[in-house]
UniProtKB/Swiss-Prot annotation:
Residues 162-247 form the PPIase FKBP-type domain. Its main location: cytoplasm. Its EC number is 5.2.1.8. The lineage of its organism: Bacteria, Pseudomonadati, Pseudomonadota, Gammaproteobacteria, Cardiobacteriales. It catalyses: [protein]-peptidylproline (omega=180) = [protein]-peptidylproline (omega=0). InterPro entries: PPIase_dom_sf, PPIase_FKBP_dom, Trig_fac, Trigger_fac_C, Trigger_fac_C_sf, Trigger_fac_ribosome-bd_bac, Trigger_fac_ribosome-bd_sf, Trigger_fact/SurA_dom_sf. GO terms for cellular component: cytoplasm. This is Trigger factor. SUPFAM superfamilies: FKBP-like, Triger factor/SurA peptide-binding domain-like, Trigger factor ribosome-binding domain. Involved in protein export. Acts as a chaperone by maintaining the newly synthesized protein in an open conformation. Functions as a peptidyl-prolyl cis-trans isomerase. Keywords: Cell cycle, Cell division, Chaperone, Cytoplasm, Isomerase, Rotamase. Coiled coil: none annotated. Gene3D superfamilies: 3.10.50.40, Trigger factor ribosome-binding domain, Trigger factor, C-terminal domain. It comes from Dichelobacter nodosus (strain VCS1703A). It is found in: Cytoplasm. The gene is tig.
Amino acid sequence: MESSIEKLEGLAHKLTVEIPAGDIDQAVTQRLKSLRPRLRIDGFRPGKVPPHIIKQRYGISARQDVLGDEIDRSYREIISKSDYAPVAPPQIELISGFKEGEALKFEAIFEVMPEVVVNGLDALDITLPDAQLSDKDVDEMIDTLRRQRANFVESDKIAGNGDRLTLDFIGTLNGEPFEGGKGEDFCFNLGSGQMLPDFERGLQGMKAGEEKSFDVQFPEDYPSENLAGKTAQFAATLKKVEAMILPEVDESFIKAFGIASGDAADFRRAIRDNMSRELEKAKRRIKRERLFDAILEKNADQIVPNASLHQEMERMAKEFNLEKQIPDTEKRHQLMHQLFEKNAKRRIQLGLLLGKLFDERQIEIDQSRVQERLESIAATYEDPEEVKKWYQNDEKSRRDLEAVILEEQLIDQLYEKAKVSYETRSFQEIMAVNAQIHG
């Protein structure tokens, strides 16, 4: 057997292997001989089928099996004796070996892990948002809960924020209707942000029974390419306006949220405690993402294996059920690159950089932090002790929690050398920033 490995562009390498024809033909002959005792062919006694008949019937498939086995065996053997560590199965191209008397020759293209060097850790400049929970924030949260349990009553009032509207509409672009631009008995809450800003503004001040036409500007990043950045014309008929009737914050309302006492002070305390937990969780997440963004900015040229990038995009596409939505393979792959390539590359780069930092620093898990986080998680459930017991008995959940804490310990170490400044934000602003973080 002869072999050679050639470096290609980026992280790719090409392994070329040639196995003599005699070795392949001998393996095929042995494969056919092994079939003889088990064959049942009309006109021949079991185990007595002539070799030339076996070869006529099974020669091609036997050769295919041998080629597959030899390619797999030789590839594994050569790679195991080399210094290469492929990141994914190779792409195989069979050059020769299809015919009897022909040597098996194939090429295997594979990628290796890139060299990882983390730069710029002493020059990280990060701005973090900060907020203190106020009584006003608690009041606004209670109002949000009231709106979630609101009733709606049909009214002859003019449409305003908070009202539930029922309407028919049709949109046109350059005088032509477009897909998704038509609705009948469409219902939504005005001011909720469910529709584009121009669409909601166009309905403000209308009364049931009125018709109105208005322009709607689509944003540049709108998912539909034929609408992105363009202005469409909409004609709307408002069929019904329903005014929002908020419930009183009374004993029955409070008990509906699990506060057994029905007491307003207990209710506010529970709301504040939950908001405090959510605020701290959001601040931790933002702190994490800002650090990762800063590290990636300093290491933007970190190369990633194409195989890993493709695998991550495929995984993300599966999460979005893209195969079922777009059966056409070519179109799906094009959309997959448009939607996921940037985030997939970011995830892989980050994984390589963080993996390197973990290897270098060998951080030991702080079990007191694990226990503290477990207490915090358990406190959000009706039976905290049962939750803690479940984490202690479920190995995977415990490992996942420890992985989060270990990452936070690394983050704390990296922040020790970073230049950090803070900007005052409201609770709502921090929650909005947190909501924009992907994955």
